[in-house]
């Protein structure tokens, strides 16, 4: 991305509002001396038309950043607005919690072509708990301070969302766009391999997501 490198200097701070983990490492070769500010996004947005977007809040905060100079600089940009910013000294744990939420919410809705109502099924809940337990083990290996019952907490949070809410991957499927699969399930499988932590369920999910995403990239929306 030469255009991005050209915009970055030693005093530049680049906020990355993207799902997943390891943003700074992924962007290091593109931003030169600029500082990367990983930013967690909690709200849900659905494009209803060219000039219409449905905005839904999904918790007490809209963004989360690390409580460091970069995070504080990002938060200051939104002073005086209605956006609610959490600054945390343990950003890694927050990032993993959001990743865990996304690793069930996005894939399951996209693969089943159903909105959040699909998580009301007991069999889907059981599958989600197994996927989450596996992913949480990887997160702990990576240094995230996740609770022993983190999987149950994440699923409980998901079940508070409106049944008609969608996810970014679900909307990508409807629009015929490839998925951001490598940043979500792909990141869990890759991190698990790095720590020699087995991820059979997430690896199976990754295979299905890649197959579906590749078909969308080829123009097959079925």
Where would I find each of the regions flagged by the language model?
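Rossmann-like NAD(P)(H) cofactor-binding subdomain of soluble oxidoreductases
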Residues: 1-52
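Active-site-proximal catalytic alpha-helix in oxidoreductases
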Residues: 92-137, 162-163
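NAD(P)-dependent Rossmann-like dehydrogenase/reductase catalytic/cofactor-binding core
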Residues: 79, 129-222
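FAD/FMN-dependent oxidoreductases across multiple families
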Residues: 72-106, 153-154
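Active-site substrate-recognition segment that forms the wall
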Residues: 40, 44, 50-52, 59, ...
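Short beta-strand and adjoining strand-loop segment in the mid-core
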Residues: 51-75, 125
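Short active-site oxyanion
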Residues: 10-14, 62-63, 194
């Amino acid at each position: 991305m030469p255009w991005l490198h050209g915009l970055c200097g030693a005093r530049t701070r680049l906020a990355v509002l993207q799902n997943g983990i390891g943003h700074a490492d992924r962007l290091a070769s593109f931003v030169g001396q600029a500082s990367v500010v990983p930013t967690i996004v909690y709200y849900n947005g659905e494009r209803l038309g060219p000039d219409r977007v449905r905005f839904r809040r999904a918790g007490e905060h809209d963004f989360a950043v690390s409580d460091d100079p970069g995070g504080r600089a990002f938060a200051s940009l939104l002073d005086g607005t209605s956006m609610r910013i959490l600054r945390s000294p343990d950003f890694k744990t927050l990032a993993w919690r959001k990743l865990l939420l996304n690793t069930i919410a996005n894939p399951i809705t996209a693969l089943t072509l159903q909105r959040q109502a699909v998580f009301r099924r007991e069999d889907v809940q059981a599958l989600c708990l197994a996927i989450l337990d596996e992913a949480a083990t990887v997160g702990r290996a990576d240094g995230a301070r996740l609770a022993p019952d983190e999987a149950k907490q994440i699923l409980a949070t998901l079940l508070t969302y409106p049944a008609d809410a969608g996810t970014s991957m679900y909307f990508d499927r409807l629009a015929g766009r490839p998925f951001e699969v490598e940043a979500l399930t792909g990141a869990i499988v890759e991190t698990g391999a790095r720590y020699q932590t087995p991820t059979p369920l997430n690896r199976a999910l990754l295979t299905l997501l890649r197959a579906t995403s590749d078909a969308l990239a080829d123009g097959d929306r079925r």
